[in-house]
C-alpha cells in the first residue's frame, strides 16, 4: 500500500494510512470480543496519539526537520499497525482444521515417498511395483505408531475448542485413517531399508559401464522440477499456461536438435531406444543414476545395438522427419492465438472471440465443417467399417446440433430464427458415441479371452479412443474444434515421424504425452480460475439438470485434452505385439509425474493458508489439481486393465 501514497505530501500519507487503520480496527472490534488486548489495536492507539502530536506541530507551521522525522515515525507506526491488524484478522476470519489438513498432507507425502523409492523397481527390467504392506503391518513399529496416532487423536478431539473433521468421523473410520497412515509409514521405512541394503551390495559390486543422461532425460527432469517449483508463486499459477507453452516449445527444439544430429552427424553419441520392442526395455530411463546387477537391474540409458531407423529413411519421409518438430511448433503457435487465457493477457481479443461474434457466423460454420471433416480423416484410419459409419453419422449429428442451437449455419440457411435446445440432435450423437465405445469394449473383451488375438485388442483400443474424440467434438464449443483437430494432427505427426524413427523409451514418450495433454488443457481456453469452466457442456442433450451426467460431461469437456493424450499413449504403447511391460512403466511414470506437483502443492497451500491470494488463486488451483488427480487415477486404472504382461507370462 505504501508505494501507492509514497509520492503524496506527508499529511495526505498519514491521512490515508489512518483511514485504513481505522477500518481494520473496526473489523477487529466486530470479530474479537477482547479487542483492546490485541497487539494491533494497541499499536493503532499509539499511532493515533503520535499522529495527534504531528498535527499540532503542523498547525504551528513548524516546517523543521523535527516535523519530518516525527511524520516518518508515525507513518512507520501506522504501517506496523496495519500489518499486525491484517494478520490478526486473517487468523480470526479463517479458521482452518489444521489437524485434518496435517493428516491429509502426511498421507499424500507417504504415497509420494513410496513412488519415489519404487522408481528403480518399477522402471527396472521386470517393471514390477511391490509395495510391502503386509510385512510392515505385522511388525512392532506399526503397532507403536498406531498407538501413538490414537493417543494424538484422543488428545486433539478432547480439547475444549476442537472442531476437526477427523473428530466428527466414527471411530472405525478414524481408526482406518490412522492404520493406513501407520502402514504407509512402515512401508516407506521398509522400502528405504531395502534400498540402502541394495546400495551396499551395489557398492561392493560396482557396475562395469557408466550410465548417463540423455538430453530429453535432462529436459524431462528439469522441466518437471521447474514446474513444481513455480507453483509456490501466485503469478506463476495465474499464468501457468505460459509454463507449459514454454516446456513444449523447448521440447520441440530438443527433438529438432536430436533429429538433425542423428541425420547429419550419425548416432554415435545419441542412444536410440524403442519404447515398444520387448527386449529393449532393459535400458529404460529412470530418475536416478546407477546400474544394479542381476535380473532386477535398472539403468539410466543404454547404448543401441541396432542401427538407427533414420538411416533407412529416404526421400520425402526423411524430409518429413526433419520438418516434423517445426510443424508441431507452428501448430502450437496457432493454438496460442485461438484462446487467450490466464490473467495478464486475458483481456486481449483473440481468434476465438472473433469467430464467436455474430458477424462472423459464416466463417465459424465453414471452420466447424472443415474441422469435423478433418477429425473423421484423422480418426477413421484404424477403425472398423461399422465404427467408420458411426463416426461419420456422429460428426454429421454434431454439426446439426450446433446448427440447431444457433452456433453455426447450414449452407441453405440465411438466419437462425428457429433456435432450439438441440436435445434430439445431441442424443442422436450420444447413440453413436455409445455404439463406438461398446464396439471397442467388445473387441477388448474378445482379446482378453483369446490372448493371441492382438488385432482385436489394438482395434478395440483405437475405437475407444475414437469414441472419446467424438464425445469431445460434441461437448467442445465450435471455435474449439480446431484445437481437437490440431491435437489429433500432432499425435499423428509425433507417432509417424518422431517417436517411431527416434525410438524413444517409455519414460520419454509418457512425459511427452503428459506435457502435451497439459498444454492442450490450456489451449482450450481453460485456466486456474473457476470462471473459465464451461458449465454449458454439462447440459448437452439434457432436458433438465441431472447431477451425475452433468458432472461427468463438464469434467470430460474440461479435461478432454489430458484424457485424449493419455488414451493415445495407451494406443501407441500397444501398437506392437511385443509391447512387453510398456504399459506398466507408462502407468508408473504417469502416476509419478502427476502426483509430484500435487503433493508439493498441497504442502505449499497448507503453509500459505494465510496468504492474501489464498482464496482467489491458490484454492481454485487446488480444486483443479484434485480433479486432475481423480482423472489420473482413472487413467492409471485403465492402464492397469490393459496391461497383459502378467497374463501373457
Regions from the PLM with identified roles:
Residues 96-649:
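Alpha-helical transmembrane segments of integral membrane proteins
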Amino acid at each position: 500500500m505504501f508505494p501507492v501514497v509514497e509520492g503524496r505530501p506527508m499529511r495526505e500519507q498519514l491521512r490515508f494510512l489512518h483511514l485504513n487503520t481505522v477500518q481494520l480496527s473496526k473489523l477487529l472490534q466486530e470479530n474479537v470480543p477482547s479487542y483492546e488486548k490485541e497487539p494491533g489495536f494497541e499499536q493503532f492507539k499509539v499511532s493515533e496519539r503520535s499522529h495527534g502530536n504531528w498535527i499540532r506541530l503542523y498547525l504551528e507551521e513548524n516546517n523543521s526537520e523535527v516535523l519530518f522525522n516525527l511524520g516518518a515515525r508515525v507513518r512507520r507506526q501506522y504501517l506496523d499497525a496495519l500489518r499486525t491488524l491484517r494478520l490478526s484478522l486473517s487468523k480470526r476470519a479463517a479458521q482452518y482444521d489444521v489437524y485434518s489438513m496435517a493428516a491429509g498432507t502426511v498421507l499424500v507425502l507417504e504415497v509420494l515417498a513410496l513412488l519415489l523409492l519404487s522408481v528403480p523397481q518399477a522402471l527396472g527390467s521386470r517393471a514390477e511395483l511391490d509395495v510391502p504392506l503386509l510385512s510392515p503391518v505385522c511388525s512392532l513399529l506399526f503397532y507403536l505408531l498406531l498407538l501413538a496416532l490414537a493417543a494424538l487423536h484422543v488428545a486433539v478431539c478432547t480439547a475444549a475448542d476442537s472442531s476437526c473433521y477427523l473428530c466428527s468421523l466414527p471411530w472405525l473410520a478414524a481408526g482406518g485413517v490412522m492404520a493406513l497412515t501407520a502402514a504407509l509409514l512402515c512401508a516407506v521405512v521398509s522400502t528405504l531399508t531395502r534400498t540402502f541394503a541394495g546400495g551396499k551390495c551395489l557398492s561392493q559390486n560396482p557396475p562395469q559401464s557408466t550410465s548417463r543422461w540423455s538430453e530429453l532425460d535432462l529436459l524431462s527432469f528439469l522441466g518437471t522440477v521447474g514446474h513444481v517449483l513455480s507453483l509456490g508463486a501466485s503469478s506463476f499459477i495465474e499464468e501457468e499456461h505460459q509454463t507449459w507453452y514454454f516446456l513444449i516449445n523447448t521440447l520441440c527444439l530438443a527433438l529438432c536438435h536430436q533429429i538433425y544430429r542423428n541425420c547429419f552427424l550419425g548416432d554415435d553419441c545419441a542412444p536410440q531406444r524403442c519404447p515398444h520392442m520387448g527386449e529393449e526395455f532393459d535400458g529404460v530411463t529412470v530418475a536416478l543414476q546407477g546400474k544394479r546387477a542381476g535380473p532386477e537391474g535398472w539403468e539410466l540409458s543404454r547404448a543401441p545395438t541396432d542401427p538407427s531407423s533414420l538411416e533407412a529413411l529416404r526421400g520425402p519421409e526423411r524430409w518429413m522427419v526433419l520438418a516434423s518438430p517445426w510443424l508441431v511448433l507452428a501448430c502450437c503457435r496457432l493454438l496460442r492465438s485461438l484462446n487467450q487465457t490466464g490473467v495478464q493477457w486475458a483481456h486481449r481479443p483473440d481468434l476465438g472471440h472473433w469467430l464467436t461474434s455474430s458477424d462472423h457466423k459464416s466463417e465459424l460454420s465453414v471452420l466447424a465443417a472443415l474441422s469435423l471433416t478433418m477429425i473423421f480423416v484423422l480418426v477413421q484410419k484404424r477403425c472398423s467399417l461399422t465404427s467408420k459409419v458411426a463416426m461419420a453419422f456422429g460428426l454429421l449429428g454434431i454439426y446439426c446440433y450446433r446448427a440447431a442451437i444457433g452456433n453455426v449455419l447450414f449452407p441453405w440457411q440465411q438466419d437462425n430464427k428457429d433456435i432450439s435446445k438441440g436435445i434430439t440432435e445431441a442424443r442422436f450423437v450420444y447413440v453413436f458415441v455409445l455404439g463406438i465405445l461398446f464396439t471397442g469394449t467388445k473387441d477388448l473383451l474378445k482379446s482378453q479371452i483369446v490372448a493371441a488375438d492382438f488385432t482385436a485388442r489394438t482395434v478395440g483400443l483405437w475405437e475407444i479412443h475414437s469414441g472419446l474424440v467424438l464425445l469431445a467434438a460434441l461437448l467442445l464449443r465450435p471455435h474449439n474444434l480446431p484445437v481437437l483437430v490440431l491435437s489429433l494432427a500432432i499425435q499423428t505427426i509425433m507417432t509417424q515421424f518422431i517417436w517411431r524413427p527416434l525410438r524413444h523409451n517409455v519414460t520419454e514418450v509418457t512425459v511427452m504425452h503428459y506435457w502435451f495433454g497439459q498444454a492442450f488443457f490450456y489451449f482450450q481456453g481453460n485456466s486456474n480460475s473457476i470462471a473459465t469452466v464451461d458449465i454449458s457442456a454439462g447440459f448437452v442433450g439434457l432436458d433438465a439438470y441431472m447431477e451425475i451426467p452433468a458432472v461427468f460431461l463438464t469434467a470430460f469437456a474440461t479435461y478432454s485434452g489430458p484424457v485424449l493424450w493419455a488414451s493415445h499413449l495407451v494406443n501407441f504403447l500397444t501398437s506392437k505385439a511385443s509391447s512387453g511391460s510398456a504399459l506398466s512403466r507408462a502407468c508408473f511414470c504417469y502416476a509419478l509425474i502427476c502426483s509430484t506437483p500435487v503433493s508439493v502443492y498441497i504442502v505449499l497451500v497448507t503453509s500459505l493458508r494465510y496468504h492474501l491470494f489464498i482464496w482467489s488463486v491458490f484454492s481454485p488451483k487446488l480444486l483443479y489439481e484434485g480433479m486432475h488427480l481423480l482423472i489420473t487415477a482413472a487413467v492409471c486404472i485403465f492402464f492397469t486393465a490393459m496391461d497383459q504382461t502378467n497374463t501373457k507370462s
